[in-house]
């Protein structure tokens, strides 16, 4: 969670593919960071970083984890059920420091299920913080990973 003077998420909850299990064992394609993309924060409101003013690159990583996936041989005891709502087909808006960035964005529509899609943006930070806001249009917002790089 966000802590003033530091960084963190605001709102949302951990994605659980089946009761008692964080994330999914499904293979996520189009990434070398499979373990990272097998988890996500769902219904996230924002991610905030308190950092020095300057130029930064923001990279957001998404993967819709609710598509049917192949059964994993080493995970024979897993129960392949979903709790809560089906998030496939979620559509949401993303803004950075109040500036609209991704409008009516849907990872499932762009690349399909269990596939990574990355979105990058360069931004000048003033006022000591960088905030990425998420707004649901249909379904829920979600985020699998975030990277922030300072550009010198």
Where are these regions (language model features)?
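Compositionally biased, intrinsically disordered or flexible polar/acidic segments
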Residues: 1-152
